[in-house]
Amino acid sequence: MDQINVLINKLIYDTMNNITSLMLAVSNYEIHDNYDTVKSLIDCGFDVNAVDKHGKSVLMYAINIDSDKNINVIKLLIDHGADVNHVDSYQRSVLIHTCMYMEYGYNNKTISLLIDKGANINYICNGKNILMMIHKYLSEETFQEVFHLINNKIDINYNRSGIIRENILMRIIKKLDNKYSITTIKLLLEHGINIDHINIYGQTALMYACIYINGLKNIPIIKLLLEYGANINSKCTKGWSPLMSVFKNDIIDIKTIKFLVEKGAEINSKNCKNETMLYVFCKKLSTRIYGQACVKIFDFLIKKGISIDNPNDKGYTPLMAFIIKISEYNEYTEKFIKLLLDYGANINSKDIHGSSILNKVCCDVVSGSVSHCKIEIINTLIKYGADVNSTTLDHKTILMNLRYSIHSENYITVLEILLRNGANPNIYDEKYHKFPLLIDILNRGGELRIIKLMLQYNIDPNIVDNIGNNALLFVAKHYKKNERFSFLKLLLTYGASYNCVNKKGKSFSDYVLDKEVEYYSRTITNLSKDNRIMKNVIDSIPIKVPEKIYCLESFKMKIIRFKWNLCNRIDYDDEAIMNYLGTNDPVRLIQIIDESIKYDH
């Protein structure tokens, strides 16, 4: 009973979908030899061009997976007038139906038969012609069909009307995976395919070979394309040349680069962002694992005369591109930096906003947007001469730019590195800056340890803001009772003047509460008696002092060296200095020198 129901349902389905007995017979080849059945039905008058509800013809029913086994039935239908160019309701031709099963390696004989019988090889379905449909299944068998299509003058220069507009040459290069792909490329070139065809991005087949074919496999293709006239210095819409396109590849091989350069590729070509190949390479290195092979590429490009310091349209140099985006510090990182510097890269170059490499890296670290490896980069940059006091176009030093992130966990680490290496915390211009650095940090709620560190490295608490407040007045005026004691004492300890009067005529005493007067009076009295309070200031003199702060041959530096000799009990018999300072007592000499340096800014 169940079998009867199945048969009834199938009969109803076939009737509703206009499926004829001939359609069923031609598609039944996998069960038994259906040739005689098909011939009998044709002889009985069944229409070989009948179509079902979806416009699928009898010939299309005969074509399925491995329809080469049904080749005799297909020939029979064609011999009896089956239309080899019929198109179904989905705009698929008979030949398109045949190509749909090429993925499984079938239907090669069927394709040849249809072509020989007049099937339109240039029919377009969904933006593709037949060649574009079967090229991705290239093998020993399918290559014969490609050869057959080309010899029958299929339009090899057709380019898909879709989004990218690639031609068949580009598509084969993009998927190149066996020797038949290379043979097909050569066949297309021999038959005159347009080697200069560009997609919507302006990319050529040569650029595709540089981008998509990994490693040494691309050299034979590149060589072949150049032999047929490919322009080695063409540019896409973004200005990338084939040589620059190599660096879009997942595998960058120096032999490919050398080959292109030897064939005349312009080594200093720039893209639309004014980026050179070296810039692109440096940027690529920042986001991938690199090693000795990349050092060799660096060395080759530099020795070939590539521009070392050419900035892009944002003012970024190759060195900046490498350093700013780097995510890993390994044994080759410093080698790359040194190699660029040795050949003329400027470690203090700035972008269009006046921001130096060191400024950018320091700001990245304190903002928490990068890994810990950037701390190593900061030390390396300073080691090779990065200016710790460089300023941006808005007259801000690195220390000033960092103040926006004083609550970052990395802030104090970076701050100490900069101060230890000579960053001047006292640079201030009332015309451009509202607050001196110390007052600005206090205004932003800087921790006591930050203030102490800056005072230890000689920041001047007596530089006043635009209304005349020094750091002591600022804290006394704005800090609440429960948080200001430790700050005020620290500032007094490091020489903040309690006699400072602001533009409103207010001094420290005006902001001290009545019940605080006795405490601060006693504190000031005790500090004035202590000759040792400035020792922690001078002990923190930067290990590397900028020339614009202290000239090494100046009398001030001689005094500082004299003080160090005193502290280390080295011979300090310098009559000129002792006469100048008016004493030969070691303790008093140290005190006078400390006070002299502290109040000079």
Swiss-Prot record:
Any Pfam family from its record, for instance, is: Ank_2
Keyword line: ANK repeat, Repeat
Q: Where are the ANK repeats?
A: 17-50, 54-86, 91-123, 165-197, 201-234, 238-269, 274-310, 314-349, 361-390, 397-427, 432-463, 467-500
Report if keyword Metal-binding is assigned: no
Q: Show the Gene3D superfamilies listed in the entry.
A: Ankyrin repeat-containing domain (1.25.40.20)
SMART domains under this entry? ANK
- Keyword flag Repeat: yes
- Supply the InterPro entries for this chain: Ankyrin_rpt, Ankyrin_rpt-contain_sf, Multifunctional_regulatory
Protein name, per record = Putative ankyrin repeat protein R841
